[in-house]
Design a protein with these regions (language model features):
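Conserved aromatic-histidine-acidic binding/catalytic patches
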Residues: 5, 9-21, 25, 119, ...
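Short, hydrophobic, well-ordered secondary-structure elements
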Residues: 10-37, 163, 167
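Conserved small/polar residues in nucleotide/adenosyl-binding loops
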Residues: 1
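Polyanionic, low-complexity intrinsically disordered segments
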Residues: 110-184
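Alpha-helical context
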Residues: 4-16, 73, 107, 114, ...
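Helix-loop junctions and short alpha-helical segments
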Residues: 20-21, 28-121, 128
Length: 184
């Protein structure tokens, strides 16, 4: 970097890439949630325990019965139901992946393979926690620590690892969906 402005400009772009990447992951999880829920709804996939206890208001049931030939109500309802949800924290991602029948632990095992499943689960959970924590610090606190208010440094390499971790999660979700589609 020849000038300090360029270095700081790069860091702002890298921070933006982090927030964008997490936003894309959240959008992806919303979209695959609709697909997976529909597969269970149609009987193409085994229903998850969380699917069986998924609450739907009677007004939506009435709408579904009145337009039995259309599935539009189903996607409209899921869009509305999930519209305020963010699936990026460990808890919300775990709940959502379990709801849609592909499971948090199997996704973490595929995304972050280690010698033992327990280590994959632990490492995957830690990675998802770190992804969400850093994204929130950037998006809501200008990448500053709660404790010190000092801005956390960021590098191009960090962003590469960060985005690679997101890609590993997405690829693992895709693989789990493909396995379900093929009844593997």
């Amino acid at each position: 970097y020849k000038r300090q402005d360029n270095k700081e400009g790069c860091k702002m772009i890298w921070r933006s890439q982090i927030v964008l990447a997490e936003g894309l992951l959240d959008f992806y999880l919303h979209e695959v949630s609709k697909y997976c829920m529909f597969q269970m709804f149609c009987g193409n996939w085994e229903k998850s325990p969380k699917y069986d206890s998924f609450l739907v208001p009677m007004s939506k049931v009435e709408e579904a019965v009145s337009v039995a030939s259309s599935n539009e109500w189903f996607f409209e309802y899921l869009n509305h139901r999930f519209s305020r949800d963010v699936f990026l924290s460990v808890e919300s991602m775990r709940d959502q992946l379990n709801l849609i029948g592909i499971g948090f632990i199997p996704v973490m095992v595929k995304a972050f393979p280690r010698d033992k499943e327990e280590i994959s689960k632990k490492d995957g959970t830690k990675i998802v926690e770190e992804l969400f924590r850093r994204r929130n610090e950037i998006a809501h606190q200008n990448d500053r620590s709660h404790e010190t208010a000092v801005q956390t440094d960021i590098t191009r390499d960090f962003v590469g690892v960060y985005i690679n971790n997101i890609e590993c999660i997405v690829n693992a979700v895709d693989e789990r969906i493909e396995e379900k589609d093929l009844n593997i």
